[in-house]
UniProtKB/Swiss-Prot annotation:
The keyword S-adenosyl-L-methionine does not apply. Belongs to the beta-defensin family. Keywords: Antibiotic, Antimicrobial, Defensin, Disulfide bond, Fungicide, Membrane, Secreted, Signal. Coiled coil: none annotated. Monomer. Homodimer. Highly expressed in tongue, nasopharyngeal mucosa and skin, and to a lower extent in the Eustachian tube, lung and trachea. This is Beta-defensin 1. It comes from Chinchilla lanigera (Long-tailed chinchilla).
Length: 67
């Protein structure tokens, strides 16, 4: 029965995100950006766009054209 605790701890360590890289979080944020009709911009939004959110932990912006 103790082996289950060890396996759980090892599995937990492998699933923890590396600091600075939120793999699962970034994927979810990109998905919701696209659902809201936006796109992920690396640095800034284009002049005819407005920022509606973020696409990653590192600062990519979710931009959508102004209505």
């Amino acid at each position: 029965m103790r082996i289950h605790y060890l396996l759980f701890a090892v599995l937990f360590l492998f699933l923890m995100p590396v600091p600075g890289e939120g793999g699962i979080i970034n994927t979810i944020q990109r998905y919701f950006c696209r659902v809201r009709g936006g796109r992920c911009a690396a640095l800034t939004c284009l002049p005819r766009e407005t920022q509606i959110g973020r696409c990653s932990v590192k600062g990519r912006k979710c931009c959508r054209t102004r209505k």
